[in-house]
C-alpha cells in the first residue's frame, strides 16, 4: 500500500483563486476593517471581488471576498487576523 503525504502546500496549487467568507454584526466599521485586514496581504480589493449580504433580520453582514492566494502562509495570516478581530464573528 502506498502512502501519500499531503501537506497544505500540496492541496493548493499556488497561486490560486480563493474565497474568504466573513460574518460579523452589521456596523459601519466592519467593512472597513475586513478590507484593511485582507489588503495587508493582497493587492487593493476591487468591488467585483466582494459580495456583501445582510442577514434576514439585518443584524449581521456577510462578505465573500475573492483573492488570488500566493501561499499558505498568506492565507493563514489573513485568517488569523480576521479571527483576532473583535468585529468578526466567523471566518470560513
From Swiss-Prot:
Output the InterPro entries linked to this UniProt entry.
Answer: UPF0250_YbeD-like (IPR007454), YbeD-like_sf (IPR027471)
**What Gene3D superfamilies does the record tag this protein with?**
3.30.70.260
Q: Which Pfam families match?
A: DUF493
Q: Which residues form the signal peptide?
A: none
Cellular component terms per the entry's GO annotation: cytosol
HAMAP family documented for this protein: UPF0250 (MF_00659)
Q: Which family does it belong to?
A: Belongs to the UPF0250 family.
The record's PANTHER family line, in alphabetical order, gives:
UPF0250 PROTEIN YBED (PTHR38036:SF1)
Its recorded name reads UPF0250 protein Rmag_0541
Q: Which organism is it from?
A: Ruthia magnifica subsp. Calyptogena magnifica
- The organism's lineage? Bacteria, Pseudomonadati, Pseudomonadota, Gammaproteobacteria, Candidatus Pseudothioglobaceae
Amino acid at each position: 500500500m502506498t502512502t501519500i503525504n499531503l501537506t497544505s502546500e500540496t492541496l493548493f496549487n499556488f497561486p490560486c483563486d480563493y474565497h474568504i467568507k466573513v460574518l460579523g454584526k452589521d456596523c459601519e466599521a466592519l467593512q472597513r476593517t475586513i478590507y484593511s485586514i485582507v489588503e495587508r496581504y493582497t493587492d487593493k480589493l476591487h468591488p467585483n471581488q466582494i459580495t456583501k449580504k445582510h442577514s434576514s433580520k439585518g443584524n449581521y453582514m456577510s462578505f465573500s471576498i475573492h483573492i488570488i492566494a500566493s501561499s499558505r502562509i498568506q492565507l493563514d495570516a489573513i485568517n488569523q487576523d480576521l479571527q483576532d478581530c473583535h468585529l468578526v464573528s466567523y471566518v470560513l
